[in-house]
Amino acid sequence: MENRENLVEIPIEEEVKQAYIDYAMSVIVGRAIPDVRDGLKPVQRRILYSMYEMGLLPDKPFKKSARIVGETLGKYHPHGDQAVYEALVRMAQDFTMRYPLIIGQGNFGSIDGDPAAQMRYTEAKLSPLAVEMLTDIDKDTVDFQPNFDDTLMEPEVLPSKFPNLLCNGTSGIAVGLATSIPPHNLTEVGNALVKLAQNPQISVDEIMEILKGPDFPTGGVIENFAQVKEIYKTGRGIIKVKGKAHVEKVQGGRERIVITEIPYQVNKAELIKKIADNVRNGKIKEISDIRDETDKEGIRIVVELKRDAKGEEVLKKLYKYTPLEKGFPVNLVVLIDKEPKLVDIKTLLREFIKHRLEVILRRSKYFLKKVQDRLHIVEGLLKAINFIDDIIERIRRSKDASEARNYLMEEFGLSEKQAQAVLDLRLQRLTSLEREKLLEEEKELREKIEYYKKLVASEGERIKVFIEETEELVKKYGDKRRTFIGGVKEVKEGSITVAVLQDGSIIPVEELPLEKAPVVNILRVPFTEGLFLVSNRGRVYWIAGSQALQGSKVSLKSREEKIVGAFIREKFGNRLLLATKKGYVKKIPLAEFEYKAQGMPIIKLTEGDEVVSIASSVDETHILLFTKKGRVARFSVREVPPSTPGARGVQGIKLEKNDETSGLRIWNGEPYLLVITAKGRVKKISHEEIPKTNRGVKGTEVSGTKDTLVDLIPIKEEVELLITTKNGKAFYDKINQKDIPLSTKKSIPRTRWKLEDDEIIKVVIKKSE
């Protein structure tokens, strides 16, 4: 019978799950996602390190790409040779890399999509910036790990003085994960790094006054700076990039369009083909001819127009129907401590600074030890020179080097290394001039030791070195921005009034179009900020303020889902209050929220329950939680404990049969409350009519009618309301509390707004919200 003692039985579903996780992490860490420190994937790092070991420096001759690929495969990357060669080619293409890391000789492909020549025909060597990434790698600045067969050691990461991740960007698709980081301008990145190193507390807004956005190798135009700002705060989004084109007048009164720059990663040949296809299918009828006049001076695509065709109108069509305008997806996913993370632009900069400070620390320790070792030898030599006659005499009488070395150690107190250095001393070093040189060297070594000790002991000193090195790098390699970014000045102070609809639409308005309904809220949104939208299904959606410029819409998860509230984070406080239909309330810190356009759950709802209202949370205030049947519970915000997104919340009001929560308001000491019913009736009562109690009670009846209680609004002097009805009507009303007589909770409200028989008020919005 088979021996089963050494067998371990594992359920197949567990084994499959673990195997898949292992495979996914292998792809994420070992193939697709770059390390935040040097911005390289393993194959890129191994190619560069192999070339460095081969001595392929910028001032050295080229070597065949096939030789480089073979060296990389044989030593560090035992995978397909074509995959390695493709990675090498991409690092040499100036239309792919903003700052190429490899200098190529031969055919390395083109922006038209032409493939590179076979590796046996092309040659390559490292670029100066690649050398900057590898500098100090031999000074114990980074950790090394065994290669695939444990015969060699390879670096886990490069020292990377050059901020490659941001300057060159990257893209990659892993298992269930992807990254897409655009390239940037070295001068801007370097200046932003210096600014952040000097002041770690600066905001993303302040960073982006320096680092304005992507700088693509192919140029192009990004018109909306606000959009870029929001994406760099959240780490995710799509940046619209346009090709650069202008209209020229030609003979005969005609016009033509000349395209001189195209969006990043757009195939020029495919762009021309797409334009031609649109001419053939009739979408763009005004074009008579297309020519590609691109040469070594740059891209030039000439689009000839028919007589009477307006160049600007045709250009709009080119942007609309062809890849002359393209969305670049941004997904700032990187490996931090070997774990994939979605980060903002500040985190990318901060992690690079952290890496460089670690490199400087390790390099300083390395040099400190070297200098201390040298000082030890120099001290021994100086001691020996003072007694050189006795030493020479004794060495002559010694049987061998070992006896002479032992004599020096015992007689003069030298260490073994010092004694050996004395034995290795050449006779010419015994002159008085050489002694002076040793004394001078000793002085210099002691000064260096003090310097390196200061670097090791003080992070502030290391930051100074980092700033100096970064400024030197920018001075040496920095260049002008290629991609134009528009709207930088206007965005800083700009804002827009938007109406948030129940279906998730964001409509920009100067005054709300009354035919647009049902409206959830009207807000003045700064371009540099954004909106959180909360749905009845307990999800919160994020939308950038810049996206509201042309109108936008969040993608809700189902037809039953609708938006019930919206707010601007910067004007809302630190915590959000939610009220559910079944009488529950929940307080959740805004720090728990993620900037996700696809939404994230923020409350656990039971079957049949849903979120009906939201409000800002301030501990010193009271919650007014009211039901459709007109009951109100008033209790302190402090009675609702803060909880995580996965929690249900706590009971706020005890509901009677067939009753449900209508909404909640925050009472902040206002003397009066407006009671508003579905049939357009309003009354004013004193806040004292609703005594403060604990949460979880039945509450006080305040409506004085069987009509549904729609809202309960605290008022001090005056309030402006936007009223929307179930039939889609909307109107404004400004109410001064002096115009409404004081009533009691049992009084019947008076009709203020005359509605149709089948019409009821659905939403009441305080305009200040």
UniProtKB/Swiss-Prot annotation:
GO molecular function: ATP binding; DNA binding; DNA topoisomerase type II (double strand cut, ATP-hydrolyzing) activity
Key words of the record: ATP-binding, Cytoplasm, DNA-binding, Isomerase, Nucleotide-binding, Topoisomerase
UniProt temperature dependence: Optimum temperature is 70 degrees Celsius, active between 37 and 90 degrees Celsius.
Active site positions, chain numbering: Y121
Entry-linked PROSITE patterns: TOPO_IIA
Keyword DNA-binding found: yes
InterPro entries assigned: GyrA/parC_rep, Gyrase/topoIV_suA_C, Topo_IIA-like_dom_sf, Topo_IIA_A/C_ab, Topo_IIA_A_a_sf, Topo_IIA_dom_A, Type_II_DNA_Topoisomerases
The Topo IIA-type catalytic domain, residue ranges: 33-501
Catalytic reaction equation(s): ATP-dependent breakage, passage and rejoining of double-stranded DNA
Localization, UniProt: Cytoplasm
EC number: 5.6.2.2
A single Gene Ontology CC term: DNA topoisomerase type II (double strand cut, ATP-hydrolyzing) complex
A GO biological-process term: DNA topological change
Major subcellular site: cytoplasm
UniProt subunit comment: Heterotetramer, composed of two 'GyrA' and two 'GyrB' chains. In the heterotetramer, 'GyrA' contains the active site tyrosine that forms a transient covalent intermediate with the DNA, while 'GyrB' binds cofactors and catalyzes ATP hydrolysis.
Family designation: Belongs to the type II topoisomerase GyrA/ParC subunit family.
Domain comment quoted from the record: The C-terminal domain (CTD, residues 494-769) contains 6 tandemly repeated subdomains known as blades, each of which is composed of a 4-stranded antiparallel beta-sheet. The blades form a flat, toroidal beta-pinwheel fold, to which DNA probably binds. Unlike most CTDs, this organism is missing the canonical GyrA-box. The isolated CTD does not impart writhe, DNA wrapping necessary for supercoil introduction. The ability to supercoil DNA is recovered if the CTD is swapped with the CTD of T.maritima (residues 482-804).
Protein's job: A type II topoisomerase. Despite its similarity to DNA gyrase, this enzyme is not able to supercoil DNA, and instead acts like topoisomerase IV. Relaxes both positively and negatively supercoiled DNA in an ATP-dependent fashion, decatenates interlocked circles. This the first bacteria shown to not contain DNA gyrase, although it has 2 copies of a reverse gyrase that introduces positive supercoils. Type II topoisomerases break and join 2 DNA strands simultaneously in an ATP-dependent manner.
Designated name of the protein: Type 2 topoisomerase subunit A
Organism: Aquifex aeolicus (strain VF5)
Gene symbol of the encoding locus: gyrA
